[in-house]
C-alpha cells in the first residue's frame, strides 16, 4: 500500500491536474527500498548514496498491519507535524511515539536511520490494524480495503503538498543538510477530522 501511495504521489507531483494542483517550492525525492527486516539495510544503503545529501525531511510510509487508517505514530518535531495537520483526515497521537522511545515497541522502521544516522526531520506513518495479520499469509490485498489505501494516499499527498509549498526559513534552501532542529511537540487527533499540535 505504501508503494502504491508513493507511485501515485509521484504522478500527482509530475502531472498535476485540476483536482490535485501542485505548486512546489521544494523538491521531492521518492525512495522505494527494501531490506527493512534485515537491519534497515535499504535505508542504510540510501544514507551513503550522494543523493541522500539533498534530503532535509522525510515522510516514511510503513505497514505494521494490513489496514485500518494510516496513523502518524512518530514525528521528530512540531514543525514537520504541522504539515501532516494539513491532511483532511489526520489520525495519530504522540503517545505511540512514546512507546518507541520507552522500548515498548521492539521493531523499527527506516525512521531510525533517517533521524539517527542522517540527521533528518520527519514523520512515520503506518497501518497498525489488525496487527495480528502483519507478516502473515493474511497480510495481503485481499485482507485490506480501498478505504485504507485512500487514507494513506490522501494523507501522504496532502502532507507533501504542505511540505513542498512551505516557504518558511525553518529549513535551508541550499540543498545540503543540516535540516535544523525543531521543537518538541504534543500532537493528537481531536474531534475528527482535525489534529492539535502544541510545542
Q: Where do the protein language model's features map onto the residues?
A:
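Soluble extramembrane regions of membrane proteins in the secretory/endomembrane system
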Residues: 1-198
Amino acid at each position: 500500500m505504501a508503494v502504491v501511495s508513493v507511485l501515485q504521489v509521484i504522478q500527482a507531483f509530475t502531472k498535476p491536474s485540476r483536482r490535485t494542483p501542485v505548486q512546489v517550492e521544494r523538491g521531492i525525492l521518492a525512495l522505494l527500498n527494501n531490506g527493512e527486516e534485515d537491519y534497515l539495510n535499504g535505508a542504510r544503503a540510501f544514507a551513503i548514496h550522494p543523493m541522500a545529501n539533498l534530503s532535509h525531511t522525510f515522510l516514511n510510509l510503513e505497514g505494521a498491519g494490513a489496514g485500518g487508517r494510516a496513523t502518524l505514530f512518530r514525528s521528530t518535531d512540531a514543525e514537520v507535524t504541522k504539515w501532516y495537520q494539513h491532511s483532511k483526515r489526520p489520525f495519530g497521537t504522540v503517545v505511540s511515539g512514546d512507546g518507541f522511545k520507552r522500548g515498548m515497541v521492539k521493531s523499527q522502521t527506516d525512521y531510525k536511520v533517517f533521524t539517527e544516522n542522517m540527521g533528518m526531520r520527519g514523520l512515520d506513518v503506518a497501518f497498525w490494524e489488525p496487527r495480528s495479520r502483519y507478516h502473515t499469509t493474511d497480510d495481503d490485498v485481499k485482507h485490506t480495503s480501498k478505504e485504507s489505501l485512500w487514507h494513506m494516499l490522501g494523507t501522504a499527498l496532502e502532507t507533501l503538498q504542505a511540505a513542498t509549498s512551505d516557504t518558511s526559513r525553518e529549513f535551508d534552501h541550499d540543498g545540503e543538510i543540516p535540516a535544523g532542529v525543531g521543537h518538541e511537540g504534543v500532537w493528537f487527533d481531536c474531534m475528527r477530522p482535525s489534529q492539535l499540535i502544541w510545542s
